Structures are given as C-alpha cells and as structure tokens.
Amino acid sequence: MKPILTPRLQCIADMIENRETVADIGTDHAYLPIFLISENKCKKCIAADVATGPLSRAEKYIEKHLGKTDRIETVLSDGLKNINENCDVITVAGMGGETIAQFLEANPLPVGQTVILQPMSKAEELRKFLYNNNFFIEDEVAVSEDRRIYSVIRAVKSEQKQPTEAVEIYISAPLLAKKDSDAVKYKEKVLQAVKKKLNGLEKAENKDEESIAEQRKICERLEKEI
C-alpha cells in the first residue's frame, strides 16, 4: 500500500524514474521514499532527518506500508552530512531556499549529481546558489498546494557555470517556457514581487539606475512570457 502524496511531493516523484538510490533529506514520515519504492521508481531509498522523532515516525510508516524491507534505510543526518552512500538523486523538500543552499554548500556534490529541490520560500536565493556553484537547472515545475504556488527544481552539478539571464534568478528558463496554469500563476507571483522591488528602487532617495533598468527588463520579460 502506497501513501497519497501532496502535490509538491508528487511533483518530485514524477521527476524520478529508473534510479538506483534516492536520498530524501528531511524525510519526516518517509512518504516520498515509501511511494518511490512502491512504484519501483528506484531500487533503494535513504530516508534522512536531523531528529530522532521524525526518523522514528518514518520507520513506523515504512513498516506499515511496506512491511519489513531493506530497500529503505533511515539515517540520522544534519542535511547531507551523514549520507555516505552514492545516490543517483538527492531530494530536499519543505524547507526554505536558503536552508537548502546551506545544506548543499556544507557538503559539495560531485559533477553529474542530480538534485530535486522544493523550496518553501526564498527560491530566488536557491537558484542564485545553484547558478553560482555550477548547477544546471534542467527542469523546473510550478505546483499549487493549499492555495499557494511553489516550484520544484531538478538540477545537475556540471563542470562549469552555465550562462543565465537576469530573470532566471526569479524563474529558470525551463519554467519560463511553460504555459500550463500553474506556470502562469507562478510567473504572475514573481512579476508582482519584481514590480514591488522595482517600485521601492524607484522611490529611493539615492536611485540605483542600473538596478532599476535591470528590474524593468525582468518585468518586461515576464509580461511577455505570461
């Protein structure tokens, strides 16, 4: 029996196919690892959390849904610190973008490593980190949950920085190109945030004309893509 995932977790699961090992950081109840194993999307999962309470809950849910299994290993870990096994995919969901970036910064990943990240806030800070640390965002999907709109980012560590436009701090190229209803909602949300920032810059006593011009350009690009 597999758990029913939230839209955010389902979006992550949809990005995973035919993998050997997936590590889920901040796993809580281990819903995602249980689902991935139930659907045979990977051969093994590591369910990691920083606290013993969530890990204990995870172990109970794993046995409830899958019985005794060696396909999910629970690990007490602060971020990626104690993830010693090579993993095809690392997932981190339900945390702020800055926190996710700190996890990745504290434990540099090898070239070719895939990460799937779902920031609850400060997504622009996470994208900025990814671009500055040689990650290529190969896909980004907008997803609605509880009347809010989020994004899920799949990125791969590459050997060098990839060229990006200024707008891609706020929304990556893959999501910018999408036209589904959630993508449009996400673009509208980002556009309102950029307009608010632009308004503040324009009202400042000491105007930064370069930043104003950049934000105007970003607004124009977003309006064109909605």
Predicted region positions:
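Glycine-rich SAM-binding Motif I of class I
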Residues: 30
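Conserved S-adenosyl-L-methionine
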Residues: 25-26, 38-44
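S-adenosyl-L-methionine
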Residues: 1-19, 34, 56-85
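Active-site capping/gating segments
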Residues: 46, 50-53, 122-128, 132-165
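Conserved beta-strand signature within the Rossmann-like core of class I S-adenosyl-L-methionine
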Residues: 111-123
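An accessory alpha-helical subdomain
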Residues: 163-226
